Regions:
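Ubiquitin-like/PB1-type beta-grasp interaction modules and other compact soluble beta-rich domains
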Residues: 1-76
Length: 77
């Protein structure tokens, strides 16, 4: 399974990169992707995730060829 992972805004600094290309043999969830790609870093409070540009929960199953994006909550005024 091939997955593209992107980290936006401060999360790129938090994990030390803005994107990764991953290869896995087993089925994974969005949460699994975070844990494996960040070497087990704690999941930030209010983390937002998207799969193929649609908001997704951390327990959503990821498919081959998907793009998973992580980003902090959007704020503004």
């Amino acid at each position: 399974m091939s997955i593209k992972v992107r980290y936006f805004a401060s999360l790129g600094e938090h994990v030390g990169r803005t994107e990764s290309d991953l290869e896995f043999a087993q089925d994974l969830t969005v949460r699994d992707i975070w844990q494996l790609d960040t070497s087990g870093k704690p999941i930030p409070e209010n983390l937002l995730a998207a799969v193929n540009m649609e908001y997704a929960g951390l327990d959503v199953q990821v498919q081959d060829g998907d793009e998973v994006a992580f980003f902090p909550p959007v704020t503004g005024g």
